[in-house]
């Protein structure tokens, strides 16, 4: 299943307002999770980690928390995904929703359904880091959604250049700890800003 579900406070006009919006949504999400008798314990990166059966259940909880906060999903606050598909990949088939592995084409159709139903605005690592063709197919079939390469690029300039030529994504997650030096990281940032 999808590794992380995130919220983006699109309505915010300042950093402090963004923090306030996220705080309110997270507080409401915590209340909803408790009411459903699910655990409000958090994972390594600080997100809730309740035992739920599928991605849609997690997304439904987040949409409800946004609504309970007096906000509109897809307008005031958007849901973003970190799929971490390297962990869901077996021979270029993916288990995005269940233990069953499906083709790239079926995976793209699943992403389209999720995007439309939940107004998803950003998907990070939707396919495995070396499945360049899948990334390209997704970019060609999904518009107006940020497709973020993290594991795809690992803040590596050569991989970013390949991704640019392949039309693999329209965003990159840059992490200093992935490449090794500050100058290499800055080179990646400069190239990403140009393209």
Name these PLM-found stretches:
Residues 1-43:
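Mobile "lid/hinge" segments at catalytic clefts and subdomain interfaces of large enzymes
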Residues 8-21, 51, 95-105, 150-152:
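Active-site mouth loops of central-metabolism enzymes
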Residues 41, 51, 184:
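Short, electropositive, low-hydrophobicity segments enriched in small/polar residues
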Residues 56-195:
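Catalytic core of soluble alpha/beta enzymes
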